[in-house]
Amino acid sequence: MSNTKWIGAAAGWFFGGPIGGIIGYYVAKNFFGSKVDNKKAFEISLLILSSIVIKADGKVLKSELDYVKKFFTNTFGATKSNEYFRMFNSLNKQDLTSKLRQVCLQLNSHINHSSRLEIIHFLFGVSASDNEIHPKEIEQIKRIATYMNINP
């Protein structure tokens, strides 16, 4: 199985860019045989962007993690939320900032403007969940907005 996850990552990257690579890796590692669709790619993109914003100030706080988990539970249900949060915990151990632009551009090509605005709103909620909107978090959210063709 150890080679399978890397083959999945390579195939995912080839067909779906950086998001596809991450999805391919996790599908092969955890959900071998599962089919990944645009909805799942969107949901994983939210996790990636959340992780980047959470880590922007150099601290990962429980309140921020709880905010993301609650959002996913309310939006996608408890079972799916638990599945995604296991993935989120793994993503949080990685430095994903180098993939930020590619993830945003890929999202930009698949969702409409109002959905992109909702993502920015969600990310500000993540940032504010610890009762402090750190300037570095704002900087990351502005960068995300710019990459998604939203005037910051």
PLM feature spans:
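Small-residue-enriched hydrophobic alpha-helices in membranes
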Residues: 1-152
